[in-house]
């Protein structure tokens, strides 16, 4: 069976070989986009049975859990017990993936990066930014990792705005904003500040929070033991506890929790907020010129997407080499971004993180 997805006019995706429970699972993971009747495709992924041919050269895991192998004209990426492959030239209509690849991996490792690549080739940009829609139109909330994009966006939702995107926002060539498929991850500490989210937790989410708090005792107990090995173990346990305290919320569930609609695409942004972290407990807001923030926006996006562009480096080193340089579209995005945000009001916010995101929200509203 083939599933076709129209990602808000930014790209069309076809996934073939989808059978059984994977149909429902993939449809859920692709929210808010539903399977459509469109058969034209920008990105095509064929799910296949069996194992790939033996690689002529295999580059081992470099810390991201992935290995890359090559055969003449094709690169193969292995992760967990699955794999996916792409042809020389980084052709987005010739991607294969093992049916054993976890559905969440299929979306995060294959579909979403492929859509981003197509967007960049087609004259659009994928920003490392959340986005909300309020009475004044769409607003982008951009910034480096751990700057408060998700938290600030959800604080706006608490005040009546609608969440468009979390973490990644596509700017089509016409400037329209589009949501990529994927859930929202809500940190446990955020719930003390946002009542609608706290009150809307499911039983499973509440159980996860209890488990995360219990796991959080592990690092404290282990650090009481002597030696570097105990310290290293405590650090690993702290990472696990932090991941456990992040609640995965699908778009439709978030809409039900907050009483807001699910929105997948809007017109162009009217405001762009650059969030920066600072080590003092005060918030400052200033205006910036659009042309002065382009480098920062592209740098943040490139860093967060380095796992994709890094594949080109590995594939070029392998023997036989495979050319995947087409996966890196940041130069094209840099050239396009100036036009796409030329008429957008840009402000920069410096605030501590973590903090009550309502403070950041209110500072933005007071300035604009």
PLM feature spans:
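A noncatalytic interaction/capping subdomain that flanks phosphate/NTP-handling catalytic cores
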Residues: 1-145, 154, 158-159, 169-368
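Conserved glycine(s) of the Walker
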Residues: 147-149
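Residue-level detector of anion-binding/catalytic polar loops
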Residues: 162
């Amino acid at each position: 069976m083939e599933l076709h997805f129209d990602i808000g006019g930014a790209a069309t995706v076809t996934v073939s070989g989808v059978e059984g429970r994977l149909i429902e699972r993939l449809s859920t993971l692709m929210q808010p986009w539903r399977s459509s009747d469109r058969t034209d495709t920008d990105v095509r992924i064929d799910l296949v049975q069996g194992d790939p041919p033996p690689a002529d050269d295999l580059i081992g895991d470099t810390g991201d859990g992935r290995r890359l192998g090559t055969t003449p004209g094709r690169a193969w990426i292995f992760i967990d017990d699955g794999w996916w492959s792409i042809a020389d030239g980084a052709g987005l209509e010739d991607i294969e993936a093992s049916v054993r690849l976890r559905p969440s991996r299929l979306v995060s490792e294959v579909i979403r990066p492929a859509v981003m690549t197509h967007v960049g080739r087609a004259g659009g940009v994928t920003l490392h930014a959340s986005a909300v829609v309020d009475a004044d139109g769409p607003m982008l909330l951009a910034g480096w990792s751990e700057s408060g994009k998700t938290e600030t966006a959800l604080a706006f939702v608490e005040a009546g705005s609608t969440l468009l995107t979390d973490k990644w926002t596509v700017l089509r060539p016409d400037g329209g904003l589009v949501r990529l498929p994927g859930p929202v991850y809500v940190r446990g500490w955020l719930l003390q500040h946002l009542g609608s989210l706290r009150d809307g937790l499911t039983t499973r989410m509440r159980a996860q929070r209890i488990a995360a708090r219990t796991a959080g005792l592990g690092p404290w107990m282990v650090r009481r033991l002597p030696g570097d090995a105990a310290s290293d173990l405590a650090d690993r346990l702290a990472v696990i506890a932090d991941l456990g305290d992040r609640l995965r919320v699908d778009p439709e569930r978030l809409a039900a929790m907050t009483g807001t609609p699910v929105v997948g695409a809007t017109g162009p942004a009217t405001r762009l907020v650059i969030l920066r972290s600072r080590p003092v407990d005060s918030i400052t807001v200033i205006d910036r010129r659009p042309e002065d923030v382009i480098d920062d926006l592209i740098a943040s996006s490139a860093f967060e997407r380095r796992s994709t562009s890094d594949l080109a480096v590995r594939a070029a080193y392998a023997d036989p080499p495979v050319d995947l340089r087409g996966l890196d579209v940041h130069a094209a995005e840099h050239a396009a971004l100036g036009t796409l945000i030329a008429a957008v009001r840009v402000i920069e916010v410096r605030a501590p993180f973590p903090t009550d995101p309502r403070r950041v929200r209110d500072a933005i509203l007071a300035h604009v």
